[in-house]
């Protein structure tokens, strides 16, 4: 089942074209990893796919209400507790699975703590747990492991693999190995996207993600 299709997409940042020629199909259970140097346009591409900024040209096809985006901002309500934040987003998106989200990102012991009292890593875990309560099948993830320690990265990797196993899909900008050897890679170079290639299991692959 095709969840996201992109054809000859061009995106711009600050009025200047950043990347063009982006083409891919993302099916149920599929993952696409965006690679490229800092400033090449990965965030711009993800924001365009999420509908947060206009495309320059090309086509983006996705079912209505299919996409959930996790960017550099965690989107938390500081005065609300961890559980209340998840409930807020579940109500906004019409989703559920609050208990499962707490469990997935090891937030149960923090359930009643206000978001403003969380550490940077805890806030990031809550921001990622928010994805589970949206009910959206396509996750767009911009450097999702920032501020996470090794154990939290493993938790997120497990949550992501479970999402894919349930028929979800993801586009991820990351240089961290998340244990997705079946993922396709899209290398972004100056102004142009490369052909898709399969991710190979890298040397030093962390068996905790295998």
From Swiss-Prot:
Membrane-topology annotation of the record:
Peripheral membrane protein
SMART domains on file: AAA
Q: Which Gene3D superfamilies match?
A: P-loop containing nucleotide triphosphate hydrolases
Q: Which GO terms describe its molecular function?
A: ABC-type heme transporter activity; ATP binding; ATP hydrolysis activity
One biological process term in Gene Ontology? cytochrome complex assembly
- What reaction does this catalyse? heme b(in) + ATP + H2O = heme b(out) + ADP + phosphate + H(+)
Please name the SUPFAM superfamilies in this protein's record.
P-loop containing nucleoside triphosphate hydrolases
Leading EC class: translocase
Q: Which family does it belong to?
A: Belongs to the ABC transporter superfamily. CcmA exporter (TC 3.A.1.107) family.
For this entry, the protein name equals Cytochrome c biogenesis ATP-binding export protein CcmA
Q: Which gene encodes it?
A: ccmA
């Amino acid at each position: 089942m095709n969840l996201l299709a992109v054809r000859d997409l061009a995106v711009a940042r600050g009025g200047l074209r950043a990347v063009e020629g982006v083409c891919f199909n993302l099916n149920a259970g599929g993952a696409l990893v965006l690679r490229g140097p800092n400033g090449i346009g990965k965030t711009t591409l993800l924001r365009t796919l999420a509908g947060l900024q206009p495309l320059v040209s090309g086509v983006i096809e996705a079912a209505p209400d299919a996409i959930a985006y996790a960017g550099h901002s965690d989107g938390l309500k500081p005065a609300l507790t961890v559980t209340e934040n998840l409930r807020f987003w579940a109500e906004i998106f019409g989703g559920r699975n609050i208990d499962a989200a707490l469990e997935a990102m090891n937030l149960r012991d923090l359930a009643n703590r206000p978001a403003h009292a969380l550490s940077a890593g805890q806030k990031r875990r809550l921001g990622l747990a928010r994805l589970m309560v949206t009910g959206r099948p396509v996750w767009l993830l911009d450097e999702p492991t920032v501020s996470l320690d090794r154990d939290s990265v493993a938790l997120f990797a497990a949550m992501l693999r479970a999402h894919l196993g349930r028929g979800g899909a993801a586009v991820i900008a990351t240089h961290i190995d998340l244990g997705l050897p079946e993922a396709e890679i899209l290398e972004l170079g100056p102004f142009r996207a490369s052909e898709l290639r399969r991710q190979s299991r890298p040397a030093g692959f962390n068996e905790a993600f295998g």
